[in-house]
Amino acid sequence: MTKLTVKALSEEIGTPVDRLLQQFSDAGINKKDGDSVTESEKQSLLVHLKKEHGSVDDSASPTRLTLQRKTRSTLSVAGSGGKSKDVQVEVRKKRTYVKASALEEEKKAEQLKAEAEEQAKRDAEEAAVRELEQKAQREAEEQAKREAEAEAKAKREAEEKAKRAEADKAKKEMTKKNEQAKKEAEELKARQELEATRKAEAEAAKLVEEARKLAEENEARWKEEEQKKSAAEKDADYHVTTSSHAREAEDAADRKEEQQPRRRKKKAKPAEAAAPRGGRNQRGGRNKKAQVNKPTSMQHGFDKSATVAKQDVAIGETIVVSELASKMSVKATEVIKVMMKMGAMATINQVIDQETAQLVAEEMGHKVILRKENELEEAVLSDRDNSAEAEGRAPVVTIMGHVDHGKTSTLDYIRRAHVADAEAGGITQHIGAYHVETDNGMITFLDTPGHAAFTAMRARGAQATDIVVLVVAADDGVMPQTIEAIQHAKAAGVPLIVAVNKIDKEDANPDNVKNELAQYDVIPEEWGGENMFVHISAKQGTNIDGLLEAILLQSEVLELTAVREGMASGVVVESRLDKGRGPVATVLVQSGTLNKGDIVLCGQEYGRVRAMRDENGKEIESAGPSIPVEILGLSGVPASGDEATVVRDERKAREVANYRQGKFRDVKLARQQKAKLENMFSNMTAGEVAELNVVLKADVQGSVEAIADSLRKLSTDEVKVNIVGSGVGGITETDAVLAAASNAIILGFNVRADATARRTIENENLDLRYYSIIYQLIDEVKAAMGGMLAPEFKQEIIGLAQVRDVFKSPKLGAIAGCMVTEGTIKRSNPIRVLRDNVVIYEGELESLRRFKDDVAEVKNGYECGIGVKNYNDVRVGDQIEVFEIVEIKRTLD
C-alpha cells in the first residue's frame, strides 16, 4: 500500500501544506512535508479539528449537524427591445439539526439563568429594603442626637446666662467696692500729700529762717546788698538772698509746689518712683530728693524688681556668704537681706550649708549647680582600668584564738619556719601576713595578736578576711578571748573553721571543746551545724593537711574571685615607721596587680612604690590578688584598714590625700557620734529593719542570760535587739573595741569598765551605761527602741483662703488676692490649690504679704496676697488650703 505523505494529504483535502502542518502541530503531532501520515494520526487530527470547531461528546459524535443545499436554475427575464435574457439563479439553503439532549441542556441552562436572575432580583429587593430600614434608623438616631444636642445646648445657654447674670452682679458689686476703695484711697492720698506739703513748707521756712539769721550775723559785710534788696525781702521773695542755703531751700519748696498738681493726676507707682537728679536752680551739685509717692495702704506692695543677670552658681557642701554673693555678682548685703527675709540671720563671713545656699540662690533667680566636695576623690578612684574578667583567687584566712592556744605555731608549721621562737615570750607582738603554696593551692594567712587588728580593720570598713580559723586548745577549752573571737567573727559575717589544737596531750578532751562551743552557736557539721571541726597538733604536725583541705573546701563554697589584670587595690594590714626606710606598709592586694613604680593612695597618705618585699624580705616587682607585700615610698604612715588604691596621676593623688586630711576631723566626730543611744534613730536606713546592737556585761552568768533573754523578747518586726557580745566580768578594752566596730552601746549590770576600756570608750565616744536594777535597764532599752520606730504622720488643715482677685507681678508671676475664711495661713507650711473642691495643685507658698509687708501668718478674716511657687494658673474662686504634717510618736506595745 502506498504511504500517504503530508503533502499528498494536503492536496487531497484541499488545504495548504503550511496550514496542515500547523494543524498537526496543534494536535500534538510534529510533521514535515515529506513525512508519511498513518491512519491513527489522521484520526487524531480529525478529532482535534472537531473539538476546535464544535464540542463533541466522548464518542466524538456531533450534537449539532448543519446541512447546506445549493440548487441552480435558469430564469428568463425580459430585456430591452423585446428580447428575453436568461439569468442563472442559485438558491442556497442551510439547515441545522440539534440533538434532543442538547436542547434539554439549553432549556436547563435557560432555566438556571432565569432562576439566577430571579434570585438576584430578590436579593436586590431585600438589600434595598435593608438599606431603607438602616437609613430610617440612622435618620431616627440623628434626629434623637440633634434633639439631645439642642436640649443640652439650651441647658448650657441657660447655665451660661445664669452664670453671666451672677458674674455681672458680682462685677457690679466689685466695681462698687473698687470705686469706694478708690475714693477712700484718693482721700487718704490727698490728706497725705497735704500733710507732706505742709511739712515741706515748714522745713523750707525753717531753712529760710536759718538763712536770715546767718545774713543778720554777717550784716556788716552784706549791708550794702541788704539795702538794695530790702524791698524784695518785704514781699517774701527769698530768691534774692545771698545765702546759698536759703536759695536751695526756696528752690526745693518751689519745685514741690510746681509738682503737686502733676502728682495728683498720676497713679502711684511705688516701684518706678524715683527722686529727681537735681534741679536747674541747684548749685554746687547738692541735690535734694523730691517727695517720693508712696503706695497707699489699700494696695499690696509687690514691687517690680530690677532685672538681674542670671548666673550658674556652683555650690559645694559649705560656702561662705561673701563667696556666694561673689558668685551671684551681687553685694553680700543683698544676700544677707534675702536670708533675713527667709528667716535666717547670717553675717558676711558666716559659713552656710549647701541647702541654705541653694534656697538663697534660687530665691534671687539664679540657677544652682550642686557640687560634691569629694568629686575629685570619686573621679580619681573611678579612673581605673579593671575591664578584665574576674578569676578565682586564693582565700585570705585569719588565725584567731586565746593566748597560747597555738595560733602562731599552727601557722609556723604550715610555713615550715620558726617564727614563734623569735617572738618575745612566744607571744605574737605584731601583725604578720603570709601566703603559702600548698599541694592543693595557695592560701594567705593573717596572724593577729588576739583579734585587735581584725576588729580595727572592720571598724574602718575593711573586709580583708574571707575565712576565720579559730584555734582552741583541747586541754584548756573555751577561754574568754575564744568567746570574743567568736563574737567578732559572727559580727563580721565570716565563716568559722574550728581547729582543736594540742590533741597530742594526755589531758586533751576534744569532745568537751565541742560541747562548750555549742553553747555559743558554733555547732559541728556532724551534729547538724555549719562549722567544720579539725583536730590538729601544731607541734607534731598532726592533721595539718586536713585543716588546709577544710580551708580550701570552704573557699570553693564561697567562690572567691578577683580581677587579676589592671590597676591594683587592697587594704593596709599593718604599718610602721622604720628608722632607716621611712613609712612601711603591709598591703594585702585584693584585686589587680601591684607593680613597682605604681602611684598608691592609702587613706590620707600617697606616694610612688619605691620598693616591694614579700613576707620573706625578698625584693619583688609585682604582686597579684591575695598576696601580702611590704611597700616603701608613702608620704606617711597609713592606718590599719585603710584602702590602698593605685591611681594614674600623682598630683591628683596628693590633692585627694590633702582633702582627706582636712576632712579627718569631721569624719572622726561623725564616727564618734554614731554609737550614741540618742542617735540610733538617725542611723536607720529607710525600708530596713532597725537593729539596736548591744554589748552586755554582768556580774554573774545568770544575770547575763536573764537580761539577754529579756532584751531579745523586746524585738519586733521593725526593731531588733542584736546582742553582739556578752559575758561575765568587768568591761574590758576588747568589749569597747567590739562596740566601736559594731556601732553598739555597752550595758554594764553591776560591773564597771577598767582604765584601758574607759580610755577607749572616751576616745571613740561610745555610749556606756551602768545599771543595778534590771527593770531600769529594760525600760531604757525599750525607750531607745521606741525612738527607732518609723514615725507616723498625718495631715491637719490649719487654714483656708478664698481667691478674690488675681494680680500680676513681674518677679513672682500670678499673685492671688485672698480672704482668709478659716484658720490661719502660715508661710512655712505646704499648700493645696482647690478648684470646685478638687485638688489641682500641691506645693508651697513663695510669698505671703499683708499689704506691702512680708508676714509669717495671716489670721481668719484678713486679706492677704499669696504667691504660689512654680504655679501661675490661679483663678478667681479658687481655694488655697494650708496644712501641716504632724508626727505621731510611736511606742512599743
From Swiss-Prot:
Keyword vocabulary terms for this entry: Cytoplasm, GTP-binding, Initiation factor, Nucleotide-binding, Protein biosynthesis
Matching InterPro entries: DNA-bd_dom_put_sf, EF-G-like_DII, EFTu-like_2, IF2_assoc_dom_bac, IF2_II, IF2_N, P-loop_NTPase, Small_GTP-bd
Region Disordered: start-end pairs: 51-203, 216-299
Domain of life (superkingdom): Bacteria
Region (G5): 537-539
Region (G4): 501-504
GO molecular function: GTP binding; GTPase activity; guanosine tetraphosphate binding; translation initiation factor activity
Record flagged with keyword Chloroplast: no
Domain tr-type G: 392-561
Compositional bias per record (Basic and acidic residues), positions renumbered to this chain: 102-203, 216-238, 245-261
Region (G3), start-end ranges: 447-450
Region (G2): 426-430
Binding site for GTP: 401-408, 447-451, 501-504
Protein localization: Cytoplasm
G1: region residues: 401-408
Biological role stated in the UniProt entry: One of the essential components for the initiation of protein synthesis. Protects formylmethionyl-tRNA from spontaneous hydrolysis and promotes its binding to the 30S ribosomal subunits. Also involved in the hydrolysis of GTP during the formation of the 70S ribosomal complex.
Name of the featured protein: Translation initiation factor IF-2
Organism: Aliivibrio fischeri (strain ATCC 700601 / ES114) (Vibrio fischeri)
